[in-house]
Swiss-Prot record:
Primary enzyme class: ligase
Protein name: Glycine--tRNA ligase alpha subunit
CDD domains reported in the protein's UniProt record: GlyRS_alpha_core (cd00733)
Family assignment from sequence similarity: Belongs to the class-II aminoacyl-tRNA synthetase family.
Coiled coil: none
Upper classification of the organism: Bacteria, Pseudomonadati, Pseudomonadota, Betaproteobacteria, Burkholderiales
């Protein structure tokens, strides 16, 4: 049986062999691996890029006080970004399942059409959910736009839901029963031991004790800071301010502090920031002469 951390190590080793830069998680609150600069910003422009990383993801509204067996406000994704998307991307994915000990000939693996959109990032793509014996474990996306900019060349994104994948591989019904690792003395460390208290307390904070007044003020401050930084222009610091605004919005949404009509307006404000950041980043890379294109040309020579 693969432990949770062995699943991560296996994926790291596999995608390392496919020429991916193995990066670290983005060190800010994000709702998905797509928000990491290694995906959102690197999907912009013509430069080639291959990367893989684990991303802790926060979705405050999905918290259930540690009482739901598969619903969490903090969870893990394993993200793979391939640009340009290679024609054999599906074969590469199947290869990763084989590395995890999953034989496609003995399992029901289905690709269910599910186009993807992230309104706050101004991003969308053609995609598929991957179902393994009836459980969704991965999302495939071919990005068409990011930050309102067309993706040329197309970026391929593979997002593994690590908890769901591990629940299948370990044959458990609750995420909290997952074996994180086998301790030095043979004692198992469970997902429950690592994260259950965090789910209880963070859910309590998100739903009951966060200050809406403070969060509204923070949102306005982060939005203003992002706009100010883009005038410099400093695309990367501006993007971090936009990410902070997005997480603050998610906290307000979980707190029930934003009405349905206000929600659409706030999403629009974040989307405007994302689009402005995307354009600023593209412009900055263009001024540099798209250096990774030169690197590729040098390798070809």
């Amino acid at each position: 049986m693969l432990t949770f951390q062995q699943i991560i190590l296996t994926l790291q080793e596999y995608w390392d062999k496919q020429g991916c830069a193995l990066l670290q998680p983005y060190d800010m609150e994000v709702g998905a691996g797509t928000s990491h600069t290694a995906t959102f910003l690197r999907a912009i422009g013509p430069e080639p890029w291959r990367a893989a990383y684990v991303q802790p993801s926060r979705r405050p509204k999905d918290g259930r006080y540690g009482e739901n067996p598969n619903r969490l406000q903090h969870y893990y994704q394993y993200q793979v970004v391939l640009k340009p998307a290679p024609p054999e991307i599906l074969d590469l994915y199947i290869g990763s399942l084989k590395a995890l000990g999953i034989d496609p000939a003995q399992h029901d693996i289905r690709f269910v059409e599910d186009d993807w959109e992230n309104p706050t990032l101004g991003a969308w793509g053609l995609g598929w959910e991957v179902w393994l014996n009836g459980m969704e474990v991965t999302q495939f996306t071919y990005f068409q736009q990011v930050g309102g900019l067309d993706c040329t060349p197309t970026t391929g994104e593979i997002t593994y839901g690590l908890e769901r994948l591990a629940m299948y591989l370990q044959n458990v019904e609750s995420v909290y029963d997952l074996v994180w690792t086998e301790g030095a003395n043979g004692q198992r460390v469970l997902y429950r031991d690592v994260f259950h208290q965090n789910e209880v307390e963070q859910s309590t904070y998100n739903f009951e004790h966060s200050s809406a007044e403070m969060l509204f003020a923070h949102f306005n401050d982060y939005e203003a800071e992002a706009k100010r930084l883009m005038e410099v222009p400093l695309a990367l610091p501006a993007y971090e301010a936009a990410l902070k605004a997005a997480h603050t919005f998610n906290m307000l949404d979980a707190r029930g502090a934003i009405s349905v009509t206000e929600r659409a307006a706030y999403i629009g404000r974040i989307r405007n920031l994302s689009r402005a950041v995307a354009q600023a980043y593209y412009d900055s890379r263009e001024r540099l002469g798209f250096p990774m294109l030169r690197n590729k040309a040098g390798e070809a020579a």
